[in-house]
């Protein structure tokens, strides 16, 4: 059966699950822009419980696509000194973070989520912007293999934490 463009313009979509918590989408680049409609179409969720938080300014695009939907839009840069406070404003135990951003340290965010009972899906394993790969002297320590090992070791401290999923493949790269 062929799918036509009109099939994507449906007014009603099948709902696959209900989520009563809050969802924080960090980043509103290509992945954030793609995931928000999926959430709104296929989850039973109050749109007021969904927040998009980003450093860049895609507000005009957000308003064009989601004005009146009830979804919250916040422009704020997440840094090593403010991430706990800023993220804590929008999610707590039982809630979900979808991190589709760049330059937010995956290990820091995962540890915060584990400590606070927040589920997380992360598109990639990033480091803080001020700590790029080039600042790491040993080449082997710059690899994803090494970073995965660091993440696994850190998560051993939280054997019963909420579900955390990293590098799930939705990172479009450059």
Task: Annotate each language-model stretch with its function.
Residues 78-91:
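Conserved Rossmann-fold cofactor-binding substructure of NAD(P)-dependent oxidoreductases
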Residues 24-29:
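Conserved N-terminal Rossmann-fold NAD(P)-binding element of oxidoreductases
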Residues 1-18, 54:
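Glycine/serine-rich phosphate-binding loop and adjoining beta1-alpha1 elements at the start
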Residues 78, 98-106:
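N-terminal glycine-rich "phosphate-gripper" loop used for MgATP/nucleotide binding
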Residues 44-65:
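NAD(P)-binding Rossmann-fold cofactor-contacting core
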Residues 67-80:
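Rossmann-fold cofactor-recognition segment
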Residues 31-34:
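Hydrophobic/small residue at the entry helix of a nucleotide-binding pocket
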Residues 107-115, 123-160:
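Rossmann-fold NAD(P)-binding glycine/threonine-rich loop
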């Amino acid at each position: 059966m062929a799918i036509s463009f009109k099939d994507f313009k449906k007014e009603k979509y099948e709902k696959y699950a209900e989520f009563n918590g809050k969802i924080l989408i960090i980043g509103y680049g290509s992945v954030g822009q793609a995931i928000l409609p999926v959430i709104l179409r296929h989850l039973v969720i109050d749109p007021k419980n969904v927040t998009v938080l980003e450093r860049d300014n895609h507000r005009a695009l957000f308003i064009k696509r989601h004005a009146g939907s009830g979804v919250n839009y916040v422009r704020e840069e997440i840094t090593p000194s403010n991430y706990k406070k800023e993220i804590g404003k929008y999610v707590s135990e039982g809630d979900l973070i979808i991190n589709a951003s760049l330059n937010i340290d995956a290990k820091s965010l995962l540890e915060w989520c584990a400590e606070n009972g927040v589920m997380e899906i992360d598109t990639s394993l990033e480091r803080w912007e001020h700590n790029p790969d080039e600042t790491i002297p040993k080449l082997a320590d710059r690899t994803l293999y090494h970073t995965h090992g660091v993440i696994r070791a850190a998560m051993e401290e939280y054997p019963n934490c909420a579900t955390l999923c990293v590098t799930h493949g939705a990172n479009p790269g450059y």
